[in-house]
A protein has these predicted regions:
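Positively charged n-region of N-terminal signal peptides that target proteins for export
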Residues: 1-8
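Non-catalytic cap/lid and distal C-terminal segments of serine-dependent acyl enzymes
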Residues: 23-328
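Sec/Tat signal peptide C-region and signal peptidase I cleavage site
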Residues: 18-21
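Hydrophobic core
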Residues: 9, 13-16
Length: 328
């Protein structure tokens, strides 16, 4: 009798455990929440996730593949490549379609710099596994057309290499929401596409905003201001930066009321803190073109301040926060 009771009890414990196991790992509480009210004239929130969870390997790891291509965006044909992050369970023969993010790295960095760091890769895996974000594809190009000499032509990169070479290659190879990779296909799927960038990559992200509102709804510029001819210039007047945004909106009038910018920056230890906050503050005050908040159905601008250093790896935290809005 005792054996039967013990067996029954063991079976009950196993059965009770099955639902818990099927649910998988649970999203942990955030490690820290930073709120500010007096930096840009609006209430901002930054959530720092639990590093011990998100930076460790996920039970559902995605994969990173390389795509090679040639570009004539700068005159002579050049060889280049992008890294592409594919979420766990991606099936090249399947039917599911995925949101896509193009991420541009910082100064002196390349296609491998962010996704090649295991903390960044693990963070993306874990965010998808526990439901912070729906499964997505993430692409890592490089805007240096001659990396050895650190040569950049941001206009050619934004208008030609990204639009004519990288996007058609990636989205004809992998299953995004673009059913075709011509202008019509990209326009029809723009709600499922985002550009992001850190530091000089933030500058590159702004240039995508200037040229590709027809192809993406979401933009995530992290830790920099807007620059003109002098790349990464810290002294361009805020008024000129705002005018560059307004000119871009005028030139892409069909999308003037259909975009969302999720900006973020470090704290006072971040060398871009002052210029970045000044730009966002001016944008918030410009209520003709911007509405601050996290409801993407009525707002088009939000800002998070981490209090951290100027490091591209911080982008994993900024993405974590941005996923409260982006693709929602």
């Amino acid at each position: 009798m005792k054996r039967l009771l013990a067996l029954a009890l063991s079976l009950m414990i196993v059965l009770l455990a099955i639902p818990a196991l099927s649910e998988g790992r649970q999203r942990p509480e955030d490690k820290k929440i930073i709120e500010t009210d007096d930096v840009v004239g609006a209430h901002t929130v930054f959530k720092k996730y639990d590093n011990k969870f998100y930076d460790e390997p996920s039970e559902q790891p995605g994969t990173v593949v390389r795509l090679d291509y040639r570009t004539a965006a700068y005159g002579d044909e050049l060889d280049s490549y992008v890294n592409v992050y594919l979420p766990y369970g991606y099936d090249e023969n399947g039917a599911e379609r995925y949101n896509i993010i193009y991420f541009l790295p910082g100064t002196n960095e390349v296609q491998d710099s962010f996704i090649g760091d295991e903390k960044a890769k693990n963070a993306l895996d874990n965010m998808i596994e526990v439901g912070v974000a729906d499964p997505f594809i993430m692409v890592f190009p490089c805007y240096y057309y001659d990396y050895e000499n650190r040569l950049i032509n941001m206009e050619a990169f934004s208008e030609k290499e990204m639009r004519d070479d990288i996007m058609p290659l990636v989205e004809s190879t992998f299953r995004t929401y673009a059913e075709t990779t011509d202008d019509a296909g990209f326009i029809a799927s723009r709600d499922h596409r985002a550009f992001a960038g850190f530091s000089r990559g933030c500058y590159a992200c702004w240039h995508q905003f200037f040229h590709s509102l027809d192809r993406a709804k979401y933009f995530m510029p992290f830790s920099a201001n807007i620059s003109g001819a002098e790349e990464m210039s810290l002294d361009m007047p805020v008024e000129e930066q705002i005018q560059m945004i307004k000119d871009a909106l005028d030139a892409q009038a069909d999308y003037r009321n259909d975009f969302f910018i999720y900006a973020a920056c470090g704290g006072k230890r971040d060398m871009m803190y002052d210029v970045n906050a000044a730009l966002i503050s001016a944008m918030i005050q410009d209520t003709d073109d911007f509405s601050f908040g996290t409801d993407s159905s009525v707002n088009n601008l939000y800002y998070a301040i981490s209090g951290e250093l100027h490091q591209t790896l911080m982008s994993r935290f900024y993405l974590y926060n941005a996923f409260d809005v982006v693709f929602r």
